[in-house]
């Protein structure tokens, strides 16, 4: 494959075109009056969304240099989504603003390295100020406000707030598709641990790469399973019942894993194997928790039990098991209620007695998994297209709410970034470093400017008014009013705003210090048609 190299201004200009194409498609969705973007999907209905990272992932440009620029900004959205779960559009708008303003200065002769130092300096001060003005989230109403703003839907905010109230801020909340038109909240008892399936061939839904087991048996052991012969007797008993099985073991590999996968693919039985959670003594304790929750026994040498002698009566039972590549959730464990209560009491006593903060934290985690529940938000809609769009919004809102509980909230609608403008402007710097600071200052205005423009207003006027308004006062684009943003419930999680600014600055600094770009060029003469087999090439 032939490769082409572009240098300096040519390289940056070519990539900027891609940055602008992606960012312009994403930023129209920002704010309460933002628009939707329609994404073409092969073989299925188009997806209508206002989720920044979903749009960014779909964009592929023909020109290789433009595509590289677009992918750089898509990385900002991806990274922000990974860290905070929301704020991807804001991050994209910030990155575009920094790159555009920075490129103007680099073209005029400024040193990119000096500019980078200025950007880093200004962002460090901005992050300190965001932390200083951040407000802790505690009440149910505040949690609902965060969810409502993220999803642009008060009902969704209420669902998330209720779910977190019922299972705790750190509880497990999942989002599923409803069979009806209404969105509903359902809370079910359950336990989750951070271990996924041993092989992707165990999934029951290859599109989502998940394994859902209905009414499964659960084999719990602290042994390593390498030989298929060790578990063959119990699997033969399982086949007679036509029920699936979840195998929780120290590890499942070798001959055992191969045969489980082969039999799964042949349809002989449905089995999913996962590694046991935790390590050492803590693993044994967590397996005992799981056994009590599901009414099973831990197959362990400590009790003189062998895998070959395992019977169906020793297995745990659950209503449903949900397994992803990273997590396993066991819902409706069918253990004896009195045994579960006794175990909960035992854990509470251990928490009171322990002096180690680390041990206390781990015991509280186990208690939450044993006594806590799983909240399920069942999303309903009239059409499949609306369902997908609504589901994406609820996922963003849930992530946003968790982020708010973790690091607090700041005034929303881009107000927080403008309110720290003067503090960042006070950063002492000279020359190209000062230019880098000014680039960040310009970017701080970009989100509120875009929100205003999406609402049909002049962004510059709104920005200047906020700069001279009282702290916390901002523009509510939904109602066209000037209000105290936090009092009005228009808030953003500090973590989301922080992550968006950090990631945008990181990519912008890398972009501006790029001096050469190497791209693969498409072949001008594709391979000619070789004709049909056994016949000469056709003209």
UniProtKB/Swiss-Prot annotation:
GO terms for molecular function: ATP binding; ATP-dependent protein folding chaperone; isomerase activity; unfolded protein binding. Its main location: cytoplasm. The keyword Isomerase applies. It is found in: Cytoplasm. It catalyses: ATP + H2O + a folded polypeptide = ADP + phosphate + an unfolded polypeptide. Keywords: ATP-binding, Chaperone, Cytoplasm, Isomerase, Nucleotide-binding. InterPro entries: Chaperonin_Cpn60_CS, Cpn60/GroEL, Cpn60/GroEL/TCP-1, GroEL-like_apical_dom_sf, GROEL-like_equatorial_sf, TCP-1-like_intermed_sf. One of its GO terms (biological process) is protein refolding. It is an enzyme of class 5 (isomerase). Its EC number is 5.6.1.7. ATP binds at residues 29-32, 86-90, 413, 476-478, 492. GO terms for cellular component: cytoplasm. Together with its co-chaperonin GroES, plays an essential role in assisting protein folding. The GroEL-GroES system forms a nano-cage that allows encapsulation of the non-native substrate proteins and provides a physical environment optimized to promote and accelerate protein folding. Forms a cylinder of 14 subunits composed of two heptameric rings stacked back-to-back. Interacts with the co-chaperonin GroES. PANTHER family: 60 KDA HEAT SHOCK PROTEIN, MITOCHONDRIAL. Belongs to the chaperonin (HSP60) family. This is Chaperonin GroEL. It comes from Macrococcus caseolyticus (strain JCSC5402).
């Amino acid at each position: 494959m032939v490769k082409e190299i572009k240098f300096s201004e040519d390289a940056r200009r070519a990539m900027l075109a891609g940055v602008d194409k992606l960012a312009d498609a994403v930023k129209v969705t920002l704010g309460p009056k933002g628009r939707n973007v329609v994404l073409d999907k092969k073989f299925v209905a188009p997806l209508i969304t206002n989720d920044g990272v979903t749009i960014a992932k779909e964009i592929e440009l023909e020109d290789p240099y433009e595509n590289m620029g677009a992918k750089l900004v898509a990385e900002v959205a991806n990274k922000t989504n990974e860290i905070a779960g929301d704020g991807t559009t804001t991050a994209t708008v910030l990155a575009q603003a920094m790159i555009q303003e920075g490129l103007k200065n680099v073209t005029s002769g400024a040193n990119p390295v000096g500019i980078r130092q200025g950007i880093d300096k200004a962002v460090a001060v901005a992050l300190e100020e965001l932390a200083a003005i951040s407000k802790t989230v505690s009440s149910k109403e505040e949690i609902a406000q965060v969810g409502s703003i993220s999803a642009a839907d008060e009902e969704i905010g209420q669902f998330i707030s209720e779910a977190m109230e019922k299972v705790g801020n750190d509880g497990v909340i999942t989002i599923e598709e409803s069979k009806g038109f209404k969105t509903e909240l359902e809370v079910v008892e359950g336990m989750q641990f951070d271990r996924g399936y041993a092989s992707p061939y165990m999934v029951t839904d290859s599109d989502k790469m998940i394994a859902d087991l209905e009414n499964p048996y659960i084999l719990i052991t602290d042994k390593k399973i390498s030989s298929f012969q060790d578990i063959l007797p119990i699997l033969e008993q399982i086949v007679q019942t036509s029920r699936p099985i979840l195998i929780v073991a120290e590890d499942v590999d070798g001959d055992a894993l191969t045969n489980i996968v082969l039999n799964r693919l042949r349809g002989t039985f449905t089995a999913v194997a996962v590694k046991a959670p935790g390590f050492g003594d803590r693993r044994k304790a967590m397996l005992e928790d799981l056994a009590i929750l599901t009414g099973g026994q831990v197959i362990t040498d400590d009790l003189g039990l062998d895998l070959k002698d395992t019977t169906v009566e020793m297995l745990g039972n659950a209503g449903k098991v949900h397994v992803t590549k990273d997590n396993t959730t066991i819902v409706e464990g069918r253990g004896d209620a009195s045994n579960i209560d006794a175990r909960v009491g035992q854990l509470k006593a251990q928490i009171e007695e322990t002096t180690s903060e680390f041990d206390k934290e781990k015991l509280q985690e186990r208690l939450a998994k044993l006594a806590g529940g799983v909240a399920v938000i069942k999303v309903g809609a009239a059409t499949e297209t609306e369902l997908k769009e609504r589901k994406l919004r609820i996922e963003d809102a849930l992530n946003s709410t968790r982020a708010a509980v973790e690091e607090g909230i700041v005034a929303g609608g881009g107000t927080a970034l403008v309110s720290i403008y003067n503090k960042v402007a006070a950063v002492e710097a000279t020359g190209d470093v000062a230019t880098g600071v000014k680039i960040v200052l310009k970017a701080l205005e970009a989100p509120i400017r875009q929100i205003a423009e999406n609402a049909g207003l002049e962004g510059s006027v709104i920005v200047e008014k906020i700069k001279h308004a009282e702290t916390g006062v901002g523009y509510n684009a939904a109602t066209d009013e000037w209000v105290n943003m936090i009092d009005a419930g228009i808030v953003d999680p500090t973590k989301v705003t922080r992550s968006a600014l950090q990631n945008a600055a990181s990519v912008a600094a890398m972009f501006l210090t790029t001096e050469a770009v190497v791209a693969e060029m498409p072949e001008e003469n594709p391979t000619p048609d070789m004709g049909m087999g056994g016949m000469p090439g056709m003209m």
